[in-house]
Each structure stands twice: as C-alpha cells, then as structure tokens.
Regions:
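Acidic helix N-cap motif at the loop->helix transition within catalytic regions
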Residues: 16-19, 41-50, 91
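A conserved acidic beta->alpha catalytic loop
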Residues: 36-45, 59
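Short aromatic/hydrophobic "clamp" motif used to bind/position activated sugar donors
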Residues: 79
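Catalytic-site signature of metal-activated, phosphate-bearing donor transferases
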Residues: 65-71, 82, 89-213, 217
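Short beta-strand/loop segment that forms part of the nucleotide-sugar
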Residues: 30-38, 55, 84
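Alpha-helical repeat scaffolds
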Residues: 219-224, 254-265, 290-297, 333-342, ...
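Short, well-formed alpha-helical segments that are part of the catalytic scaffolds
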Residues: 6-28
Length: 637
C-alpha cells in the first residue's frame, strides 16, 4: 500500500546529530528516504540503522538538486522534507496525517521552532514550505534555503500544516562545528552572480548576514528582496518585510519602520505581526490609546483569518502581555491583572509576566497569599524557574515571599541555597556572611550580580569579594567604588545605586551618592528618577531642585507632573508640561497632559498635539468630541 507521507532528508557528515533526528520520528513514520551527498564520517552507517532507503548523490553545489533527487525515490502521496538537525513532534505529525487525508492545498507550511544561541536558550518560530504533494508537479528551487514552486516555476496554492519541526542547527555550538554561514554565503554569492534579480537569493543572503551579525548588510539584502518580489504569496517576501522592520527597530528608525509596516499591512492584511509591530512602536512612543486599540483588535478579531509568519503568539499572548503592561502603567490594576493572567494562560514560561503578576499582587496581598496563588497556578514548575523568580523577588526586597519560594525548592545545590539565604538576609539587614563557592555559583545561576557584591563588601569587607570582582569583568566597579579608581560608566554607577535604593540601604546609598561628583551635574536628574521610582518622592524632589531645568530627564518631567497633579497644583503642572513640550517635542505624554489639565483651552491643545501627531486616532476622537460638544452648546444658546 502506498504510504501517505515520505520523509525525505539530505545529509553530509551529520554523524554527530543524525541519530537524534531519526530516532525522533522512526516509530511513527511510514517511509524515510535519505540522500547522502558525500559523507566521510559514519553518517551513512547511522542512516542505515533507521531505513533501507539510503542513496548517494554527487554534490552539485545546489541543495534543491539534492532534495529533488530524494523526491524521485519517495513513494508517498506527500513528501515532508526534514534536515538532519531537526526533530519531529509525534502529536502534530499525526494531526498532519489527518489533514492530508482530506482535500487540501498542494504545498503546506510547517511550523519550524529553532533553538539558537548558546545551549539553545533562545527560540524563534518560523513557517517554511516543507510538505508538498508528490505528484511530479512541484519541486524545490534555490541553492540554499530552498523554495517549493510549480515545476513550470509558477506559484502554487499554499496552506498551513499543523506539524511542528524542532530545529537545532543554529545553536552556537552546532553552527560553529558545521560552519553553516560561511558555506551558505559561498553558495549564495555564486548564485547571485548568475541571478542578480532573484528576490529569493537576496532574502537568503540577508538571513545569513543577519545571523552573522552584519545588520547593515542584512537590511540592504532584505530590502532588495522585498523590492524584487514577483509574487506577494511567497513566504520569503513576507519575511523580508518582517526582517526589514526588525532591523529598523534595532536602529530606532521609527518613521521608516512605520512606513514599511503600513505597506506590509496593505499587501498582507492577514499577517498579524505587522499590526503588532505598529502597536509596539506606538507603545514605545507613549501613544497608549492607539496602541491599546490595535492590541485589542488582534485579540477580538472575528473577521480576518490571521496567519502568523514568525510570532505564533501575535494574536494572543503578546497583545495580552502588552495590554497588561499598559494598564499597569495607567494604574488600572484590575485590567492589568486580567490581561497578565490571560497572557500566562497562553505562555506559562514567561518570567516577565509571572513577575508582573507577583508585583501586582504585592500591592494588595500578604506574602503567604501571593505564594498560595503562585502554587495554584504552578509558577514554580522547576528549580530553574524558582531560582529565576527568586532573583527577581530578592532584588525587589520581597524577603518573606523569597523565603517561601526557597522552602518550596527541594533540589537546590548547597552553595546556591547559601547564596539565596544571604540575599534574603540582606533584605532583613542581617550582617552578610557568604562563602566564595556560594558567590561563584550564585553568579553562575544569575542570582548574584555586581550590585549585590558591592553591597556585601560595604557591609562586610572581610568577605572574599575583592578577589572575585577583580578577577571578573566588573573589577572596574570595585576599583571605582572602593579604591578611588577610574570613573565607571554612568549606567554602571546607577545600576549599583539603584540596588541600594531598592533595598532601603540608606547609609550605603549615602556612601555611593558621595561618589556622584565625578560625573556631570546632570547625573542628579537620573538619581532623582531612581528615588521617585522607589517611592522616595521627597528625596527625589531635593535632587530635582539642584538640577538645571534643561538637564531634567523626560521621566523627570513626567514624575514632577504626576506629583503636582496628585497634589492638585495644576498651574505648575501645566507649566512643566509645556516646558516638556519645548524640550521633548516628540513625546506624546506632554501634549496629553496639557489636554487633561488645560480644560478651558482643550480644543486648541488637541489641535497643537495633532500638528505633531497627525495620524493619532485617539486625538482625532477627542477633537470630534470637543466639536460635538461645542456644536451642542451653540445650538442650545
């Protein structure tokens, strides 16, 4: 009987990873075809342990040639192309089989979950055309990152398969071992000479440049790919626009970014990443109402059949997380908790969401109640998760909650347990005593940082901290703070000071503040911001008062406005908001404050804001409301 699906794989010198891949799907697949392109290690021997269908192919420098050769030996009704550095998930594969038994598109996009970086700690999700009908009408094209097309080079109708493929080939150690990027670039440079106008080739070069960290060249190549696309349905065309946006975001070129996003939204209205990216930019620029509108539209949509291309959480987890963040900023704690809870339900491994929920609960509940909530919702699913949460709770000074978390962990390495105990004791103002091994393991587990070490050394100079710090990349911090060494960066100085303020270490904070004189006077504004952040408003005001008005930070102006509004000193709050507009004309928040405070001139204030932000939907609504009110008032006279 003809198999439903043939697994096709091309290999060369993959002995170090091939067995793991084949073992992941041998038991539940019907036919495995392996094509070897010239291995000199044990690749073929390992392949023959799993299948009888192992074939040799003389390498032509073109991956598509090898994939198409493999397809000729496949007898299945459908082909699923897999690489040696990938594994299959059984449950989703069975869902794929069910889908393929019914009428469906000839090409199917698979979900590729890639583990990248050191030890695969970072994951990215992408879609690639990997499943296709084995009827001779479809083939691969392209020397690398092959693309499925009709045999006569026409685009073929494409659907979305439920299958998940886990890709390990871009973990740092595997990339280094295989030299993938260098190999790929050599092949692509050869192909681009023969086909300069191929958008797909430029897209692949962009991918390799991006992976190598050459962001400037990557942006050029993705831009070429986007311009040269000849069919908007190609996944690489959509991904080109996505990567252009990503790279422009990294360079903070927001206007250009919004332009490409708007263009992409028109071309691909069913790709949710583009409105999500627009909302994220609006959030960064404090246009919260417009951002909220987009996030809610992604969640509430019942019209558009969204098809994510990279971020599978673009229509659920991410909008919920961002709405939680915005409502928290607006002090709408009920809505914030609602959205963080929904975000956690979508992705229970996001530490940021968990900690935001913990911080929210700490405003209204006792530590035991918070910990009971954490237990009910399985926050501490592993020792690693518990330690990550501990790192956050101890930095924020939550001593009792941190103790409850420690008590729930049963398999913590003793030096790490010692480090956590000292962190908690520090919050309780207990004299710090810690071994060097506990310091080392605490740093390794990211429980201890330079700010902790400096604080402990200040409180107990007999600890082995000098040696640890001087033999690390934070030796300059120790030298500056304790040995009158060269000035460290402002960022590092404020990082150490913030910990002292967060933990209420007044005497130590005073010691650090005495060192600020080596910096420009504007440092006082940043120090004021820190005191304000941790609710030491009176101390913050003292620092703001010794800073020139032009040196107050944007956050400083916002802090002062909030303080004055809470104190009902509206005239002065309005004056500072106007000064904020003069100094930071592109910051939406200052315009919004003038609209809220200056009710007598509201229409004029809205018009001034719209001159700077002509596309802001919230301002347009406000102006309409004011116009309706004025028309009604005129008619009633």
């Amino acid at each position: 009987m003809r198999p439903l699906i043939s697994i096709c794989m091309i290999v060369k010198n993959e002995a170090h990873i091939l067995r793991q891949s084949l073992a992941s799907f041998r038991k539940f697949t019907e036919e495995i075809i392996i094509v070897d392109t010239g291995s000199t290690d044990e690749t073929k021997e390992i392949a023959k342990e799993f299948t009888d269908f192992v074939y040799d192919f003389e390498w032509t420098g073109n991956f598509s040639d090898a994939r198409n050769f493999a397809a000729k030996h496949a007898t299945g009704k459908w082909i699923l192309a897999i690489d040696a550095d990938e594994c299959l998930e059984e449950e989703s594969y069975l869902q794929l089989k069910k889908q393929l038994k019914a009428p469906t598109e000839p090409i199917q996009m698979a979900q590729i979950i890639s583990f990248t970086g050191e030890k695969g700690r970072v994951t990215t999700t992408n879609q690639m055309a990997r499943v296709y009908k084995n009827d001779g009408t479809i083939c691969f094209r392209g020397v690398i990152h092959e693309q499925l097309e009709g045999i006569d080079k026409h685009a073929v109708e494409t659907g979305f398969a439920p299958v998940k493929i886990y890709h390990y080939g871009y973990m740092s150690e595997i990339v280094e071992k295989q030299g993938k990027s260098d190999r790929n670039l050599r092949l692509l440079e050869k192909e681009v000479k023969n086909n300069k106008n191929s958008g797909f080739v430029h897209f692949n070069i962009g991918q390799e440049m991006n992976r190598l960290g050459d962001k400037k060249e990557a942006l050029k190549e993705f831009s070429k790919a986007f311009r040269l696309r000849d069919n908007n349905q190609y996944i690489w065309a959509k991904l080109s626009a996505y990567h252009i946006s990503e790279l422009l975001e990294q360079e903070k070129r927001y206007e250009e970014n919004l332009a490409i996003i708007e263009e992409a939204k028109v071309i691909w209205p069913n790709v949710p990443e583009f409105p999500l990216k627009k909302a994220n930019i609006l959030y960064l620029h404090h246009q919260l109402e417009d951002a909220k509108e987009i996030y809610h539209s992604l969640l509430d949509n019942k019209v558009i059949d969204y098809q994510p291309i990279v971020l599978y959480e673009a229509t659920n987890f991410m909008p919920h997380k961002m709405l939680g963040t915005i409502y928290l900023e607006e002090k709408d704690y009920t809505r914030a908790m609602t959205h963080f809870s929904k975000a956690y339900a979508e992705n229970s491994s996001d530490y940021g969401v968990m900690f935001q929920m913990i911080m929210l609960l700490s405003k209204f509940h006792q530590p035991k109640e918070i910990f009971a909530f954490m237990e009910r919702h399985n926050f501490i699913s592993s020792t690693e998760t518990g330690l990550r949460l501990l790192s956050m709770t101890t930095q924020q000074g939550y001593a009792e909650l941190s103790e409850l978390i420690v008590q729930s962990l049963t398999d913590v390495y003793p030096p790490v347990a010692e480090a956590t105990e000292v962190k908690i004791a520090t919050i309780r103002n207990v004299f710090p005593v810690i071994s060097e091994s506990a310091i080392v393991f605490g740093i390794k587990e990211e429980l201890i940082d330079a700010a902790d070490l400096c604080l402990w050394h200040y409180e107990n100079p007999q600890l082995p901290i000098e040696r640890v710090m001087k033999n690390s990349d934070v030796g300059d911090i120790y030298n500056f703070i304790f040995e009158n060494g060269p000035r460290i960066s402002k960022k590092r100085y404020l990082f150490v000071l913030e910990r002292a303020i967060a933990l209420g270490k007044g005497e130590y904070a005073d010691y650090l503040l005495a060192l600020r004189n080596v910096y420009h006077d504007s440092i006082n504004s940043h120090i004021a911001d820190l005191f304000f952040q941790y609710d030491f408003a009176d101390i913050a005001l003292d620092f703001y008062n010794i800073v020139d008005a032009d040196e107050v930070t944007k956050e400083g102006y916002i802090n002062l406005i909030n303080y004055l509004v809470d104190a009902d000193v509206m005239d002065e709050a309005l004056s500072i908001a106007e000064r904020g507009i003069d100094n930071f004309s592109t910051d939406f928040r200052f315009y919004l404050w003038t609209i809220k405070i200056d009710t007598e001139n509201r229409a004029n204030r809205i018009s001034e804001a719209m001159d700077e932000f002509p596309n802001n939907r919230y301002l347009a609504k406000l102006l309409d409301e004011v116009s309706v009110f004025q028309d009604t008032a005129t008619n009633n006279r």
